[in-house]
Amino acid sequence: MSKCILVVEDQEDNRQILRDLLGNAGYELTEAENGEEALAAVAKRRPDLILMDIQLPVMDGYAATRRIRTNPDLKSVPIIAVTSYALAGDEDKALAAGCDGYISKPYSPRDLLAKVRTYLA
């Protein structure tokens, strides 16, 4: 059975890139466009990994991550923060919110797949 990745990303173009990259690598994807949709998605199906954009409408990635981490059934699900706002201290902020890893945009497909595979190994 293929691993399920929840992609939380508000930009359709970025979701399409991830859909192509991760789908071609054999992963099953679920998508959410904001933090609230992410919470609804994890309530329906527990993913094996979450790629969480930080800058999101409605509820940002930090708040969504903190909420996900309050659910005992989801504590072990790896969350990788993905952001284009890679400023000093952002990685620490993402880790403090409960993310397990961090990758900044633009990322190389090879680097992203390597990080995903590391957390799903």
Description of each model-found segment:
Residues 53, 83:
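Active-site residues of response regulator receiver
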Residues 107-116:
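C-terminal output helix
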Residues 45, 57, 75, 87, ...:
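The feature encodes the CheY-like receiver
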Residues 16-24:
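Charged docking surfaces used in two-component/phosphorelay signaling
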Residues 9:
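Conserved acidic carboxylate
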Residues 6, 31-49, 92:
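Acidic, metal-coordinating helix/loop segments flanking the phosphotransfer/catalytic sites
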Residues 32-33, 56-59, 68, 89, ...:
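Hydrophobic residue at a beta-alpha junction
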